[in-house]
Amino acid sequence: MAARKSKGLTLMEKMIRLETERLILRDYTADDLEQYCRLKMDAKTMYYLQDIQLHSFDEAERDFAAVLSDMASANRRFYFLHMELKRNHEQVGGIGYTVEADTPVGKLVHLGYFTYPAFWGRGYTTEALAAVLR
């Protein structure tokens, strides 16, 4: 899933997009600000991730700007993807990983996901995780 950093590619050409039977997993774009904020501020969705839950639009906006900045970085560390249904583009949640360290055998990453409760128990996260790990 790691973005290839080839010289001469634009940010749009470097953007990650994965598809599964039911989902589209893709890098966030500036147009996703409202959805990102709603997801990261949702108390039920973030119940088990309270350390990264956001509590105001201003806080969410700053966090989202950092996400977009990291995506454009030559040393990208955060690979968190917008997760949406193929059939209607409804946001399911987010999934991805953070590169914690480079080791002799590869990158050490911290994997995470968060989905809206309406999508729990339907296999979406399992499906997305399989695509991310490929």
Predicted regions and their residues:
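GNAT-family acyltransferases
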Residues: A2-A118, A131
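Glycine-rich acyl-CoA binding loop
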Residues: G121-T126
